[in-house]
């Protein structure tokens, strides 16, 4: 969690180009409400910090924590601009850095990136490895201390743990008497693809290991990437060569000169999509020329910026909870979200599932949820990561009001299920009526022309023509399409009305009349493919339901009984 290991910047320069769902617009809260929300979120973050520091593990995904911490500071900027959420340090082991750790401004707007590169000479690009920052201090070639980033000025003493990491040398030759290096401790991965796998909480694994009282085998899985050498060689090639000689060759392998935004974009894309030995959360652009280390501060550096990747988990505010009823009476719940970007997709809705699932999630407007992309790029609700302090309850539909035999007739309450029945009826699984889809059914419903799912059979061309915006030709075509249903066999009508016979058993309806179907037993139905005991009972219940019996009688009166 980056605020625990690096400096927080209350001003996010350049924005994040839609990647984060943390909005820059201040909420419409009074002072009382804003204080409640800020205090509650601060307390939640502090609780997570306690777990992080005492147990060495993260209760939430790293990128989720980062976004909520960013949200807190955004609220502070709106309502308490004199306050900044400070970085907490543990109560033990505070140690000063010989050279301060700077922060990184974050840019993602193309024009700003182009301008930043154009205004500088000798620019290089590196992956922004997602680990924990550390200072290494060598005295006369001997590793004397290792300090976590902390607040950029002081951090925890990690010396003993760092000495147990195989990749970090204890002794160096041909180096200055005082050598200060800053870098990233990271969890070594095999063929990690950031755009597919995300952060996998690798940062928390490393941080947890560094805070364990007793070392574990995880130490052997930790690597180090040096990204700063205060007061080091003046040119980047010389710097990289010296680091390689010291044993830090990875820096040279993943540091490349760039001359344009196109060069930066190429590496940004390549490292996001191709396998790497570490987790990344973006790239870092840096110029070789840097001030002397004594002038560094724990604020944003002028000589380097970060161009981040979109978080694998996006935190979004819930705007509304939408309930829908399907043809069979199944209730589904969808969350409307503040528009966010997941990879290259704009997302404003995420499916929750059933009504009972929504109740389990306990999510309401104003809450924050974590969303990611599942298979085939479908948005997935991962978790409710923050609940607002003032939550207005929502009255949801009753599951008892909707079922397989509800809403064959129109009413205000039944509008969704009734429309779904008509869409199924006119679709490819039913009567396949040309030009009659949900929009047409909705217009007929709004004009009061549909009392039940068969009312349309008796509509005249004149009635259709009277529908607003229909027109003579359109009315004629729709009338012709509706009347074509009279030529359909009874088996198609039964399927259109919702008879729950699977496709694999449709042949069961061939050459069998209505009375015979009603008298079939469960055993007879179960002889067909895809029909088990439960499905057979559902079919029999459908065929004997009073509403269905009435509809079949009406069809018979219309001459549809084959």
Swiss-Prot record:
Listed transmembrane segments: none
InterPro entries hit by this protein: DNA_ligase, DNA_ligase_AS, DNA_ligase_B, DNAligase_adenylation, DNAligase_N, NA-bd_OB-fold, NAD_dep_DNA_ligaseB, NAD_DNA_ligase_OB
GO biological process, one term: DNA repair
EC numbers: 6.5.1.2
Molecular function per GO: DNA ligase (NAD+) activity
Domain of life of the native organism: Bacteria
Stored SUPFAM superfamilies: DNA ligase/mRNA capping enzyme, catalytic domain, Nucleic acid-binding proteins, RuvA domain 2-like
Keywords assigned by UniProt, alphabetized: DNA damage, DNA repair, DNA replication, Ligase, NAD
Cited SMART domains: LIGANc
Reaction(s) the record says it catalyses: NAD(+) + (deoxyribonucleotide)n-3'-hydroxyl + 5'-phospho-(deoxyribonucleotide)m = (deoxyribonucleotide)n+m + AMP + beta-nicotinamide D-nucleotide
Catalytic residues identified in the record: 128
NCBIfam families: PRK08097.1
Family: Belongs to the NAD-dependent DNA ligase family. LigB subfamily.
Annotated function: Catalyzes the formation of phosphodiester linkages between 5'-phosphoryl and 3'-hydroxyl groups in double-stranded DNA using NAD as a coenzyme and as the energy source for the reaction.
Name listed for the protein in its UniProt record: DNA ligase B
Native species: Pectobacterium carotovorum subsp. carotovorum (strain PC1)
Source lineage: Bacteria, Pseudomonadati, Pseudomonadota, Gammaproteobacteria, Enterobacterales
Gene for this chain: ligB
């Amino acid at each position: 969690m980056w605020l625990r290991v690096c400096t927080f910047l209350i001003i996010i320069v350049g924005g994040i180009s839609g990647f984060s769902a943390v909005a820059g617009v201040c909420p419409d809260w009074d002072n009382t409400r804003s204080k409640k929300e800020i205090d509650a979120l601060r307390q939640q973050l502090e609780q997570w910090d306690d777990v992080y520091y005492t147990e060495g593990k993260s209760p939430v995904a790293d990128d989720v924590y980062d976004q909520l911490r960013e949200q807190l500071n955004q609220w502070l900027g709106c309502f308490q601009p004199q306050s900044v959420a400070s970085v907490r340090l543990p109560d033990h082991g505070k140690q000063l850095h010989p050279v301060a750790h700077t922060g990184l401004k974050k840019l993602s707007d193309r024009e700003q990136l182009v301008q930043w590169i154009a205004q500088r000479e000798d620019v290089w690009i590196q992956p922004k490895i997602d680990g924990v920052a550390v200072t290494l201090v060598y005295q006369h070639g001997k590793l004397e201390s290792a300090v976590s980033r902390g607040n950029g000025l002081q951090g925890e003493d990690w010396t003993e743990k760092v000495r147990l990491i195989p990749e970090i040398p204890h002794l160096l030759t041909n180096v200055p008497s005082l050598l200060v290096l800053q870098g990233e401790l990271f969890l070594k991965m095999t063929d990690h693809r950031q755009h597919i796998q995300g952060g996998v909480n690798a940062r928390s694994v490393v941080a947890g290991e560094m805070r364990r009282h007793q070392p574990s085998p995880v130490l052997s899985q930790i690597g180090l990437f040096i990204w700063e050498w205060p007061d080091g060689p003046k040119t980047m090639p010389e710097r990289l060569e010296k680091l390689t000689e010291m044993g830090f060759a990875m820096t040279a392998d993943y540091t490349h000169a760039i001359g344009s935004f196109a060069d930066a974009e190429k590496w940004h894309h390549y490292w996001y999509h191709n396998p790497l030995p570490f987790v990344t959360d973006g790239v870092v652009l840096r110029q070789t020329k840097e001030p002397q280390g004594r002038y560094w501060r724990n604020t944003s550096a002028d000589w380097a910026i970060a161009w981040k990747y979109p978080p694998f988990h996006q935190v979004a505010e819930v705007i509304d909870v939408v309930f829908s009823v399907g043809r069979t009476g199944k209730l589904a719940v969808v969350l409307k979200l503040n528009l966010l970007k997941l990879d290259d997709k704009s997302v404003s809705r995420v499916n929750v599932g059933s009504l009972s699932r929504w109740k389990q999630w306990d999510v309401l407007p104003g809450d924050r949820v974590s969303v990611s992309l599942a298979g085939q790029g479908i948005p997935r609700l991962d978790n409710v990561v923050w609940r607002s302090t003032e939550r207005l309850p929502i009255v949801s539909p009753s599951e008892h009001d909707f079922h397989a035999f509800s809403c064959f007739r129109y009413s205000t309450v039944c509008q969704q299920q009734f429309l779904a029945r008509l869409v199924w009826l006119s679709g490819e699984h039913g009567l396949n009526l040309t030009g009659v889809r949900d929009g047409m059914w909705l217009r007929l419903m709004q004009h009061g022309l549909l009392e039940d799912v068969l009312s349309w059979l008796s509509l005249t061309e004149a009635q259709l023509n009277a529908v607003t915006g229909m027109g003579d030709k359109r009315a004629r075509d729709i009338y012709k399409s509706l009347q074509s249903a009279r030529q359909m066999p009874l088996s198609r009508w039964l399927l259109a009305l919702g008879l729950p016979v699977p496709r694999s058993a449709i042949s069961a309806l061939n050459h069998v009349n209505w009375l015979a179907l009603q008298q079939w037993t469960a055993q007879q139905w179960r002889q067909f493919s895809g029909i088990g005991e439960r499905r057979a009972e559902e079919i029999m219940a459908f065929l004997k339901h009073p509403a269905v019996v009435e509809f079949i009688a009406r069809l018979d009166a219309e001459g549809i009984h084959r």
